[in-house]
Structures are given as structure tokens and as C-alpha cells.
């Protein structure tokens, strides 16, 4: 298994995790004890990272399946303790899943751009589909200026390029 340090040395993974949990979260990961399970309070004490930051980071990682917990109930007090451990071995799968989701959204956007004809109000800089423009008699509903045809070919070309690059990076081009 790859260490946290090795993962964070990868610029793409570091950027992804940084965007997800911020600098303080990265600091928690760097100081996270290897092996075993730890409560959020223990982690805050062991790492010197603020308890709220520890909790926020762990929950964010949990939402992405990059951390897991085991819940223990104190039979005397009824209090629950969550013991956490990292699952950063999944980061590549999580990243790939998110890239595939982004690809799906880009494909849908490209289909929308190719399927529709667009009209724009030069005054308001708002773009409308043909259907909406026709419903408003090709007048802007905001300022009543005439709508002009909008050529979206540059958008479609940019989307195709982006889709091709993503597919190539996923090895499915």
C-alpha cells in the first residue's frame, strides 16, 4: 500500500485532496498515525489539528469513501465513539469515478449544444434556445431587444476537445 506522503507527492492527487479538504486537512493526513483506528479526539490531540477540522476532514473523506469508521457504544453512558481509519488506497478509483462523472456531464452538455439552436440578446448577454426565443417572438424578455442567432460551434468544439482528452486519459478514446 502507498503511504500518505507518497500519495500527496503526486501533484494531481495532492491538488484533488487539497481542493477537497484544504491545507489543514492535508496537514491532518500528513500527521495521521499509520495503522489502527483512532477517535477524532485522539487524532486532534495526536496531530495538533483543531478538533473541528479533524471532524470536517474525516466526514469529507468518508463521503468520498476515503475514510471509514467503526462505531462503539459505551454501555454505561450510552455515548458513541467513532474510531476512524483512512482508506486512501481507494483514491485512484474515486478520482476515476469523478472523472467519468464529469465526462458524462460533458457528453450531455455537448448533446444539448448540438441538438439546440441558440439566440442571444446582445444587450443582456443572455442566450436562449430556439424554443424559448420563439415563445418570446425573438424579443428578449428582459429588455425587449431583438434576439440574434448565436453560433455555438466554438463551444461544441471546445467540449469535443475536452471530452477527447478525458477519454484519452482514461484509456477509452
From Swiss-Prot:
One Pfam family hit: TFIIE_alpha
Single Gene Ontology MF annotation: DNA binding
The HTH TFE/IIEalpha-type domain, residue ranges: 9-92
Keywords: DNA-binding, Transcription, Transcription regulation
KW Transcription (keyword) present: yes
Domain of life: Archaea
Gene3D superfamilies, alphabetized: Winged helix-like DNA-binding domain superfamily/Winged helix DNA-binding domain
InterPro entries attached to this UniProt entry: TF_E_archaea, TFE, TFIIE/TFIIEa_HTH, TFIIE_asu, TFIIEa/SarR/Rpc3_HTH_dom, WH-like_DNA-bd_sf, WH_DNA-bd_sf
GO biological process, one term: regulation of DNA-templated transcription
Similarity remark: Belongs to the TFE family.
Main function: Transcription factor that plays a role in the activation of archaeal genes transcribed by RNA polymerase. Facilitates transcription initiation by enhancing TATA-box recognition by TATA-box-binding protein (Tbp), and transcription factor B (Tfb) and RNA polymerase recruitment. Not absolutely required for transcription in vitro, but particularly important in cases where Tbp or Tfb function is not optimal. It dynamically alters the nucleic acid-binding properties of RNA polymerases by stabilizing the initiation complex and destabilizing elongation complexes.
Domain comment, as recorded: The winged helix domain is involved in binding to DNA in the preinitiation complex.
Assembly information from the UniProt record: Monomer. Interaction with RNA polymerase subunits RpoF and RpoE is necessary for Tfe stimulatory transcription activity. Able to interact with Tbp and RNA polymerase in the absence of DNA promoter. Interacts both with the preinitiation and elongation complexes.
Protein name as catalogued: Transcription factor E
Species of provenance: Methanoculleus marisnigri (strain ATCC 35101 / DSM 1498 / JR1)
Gene (name only): tfe
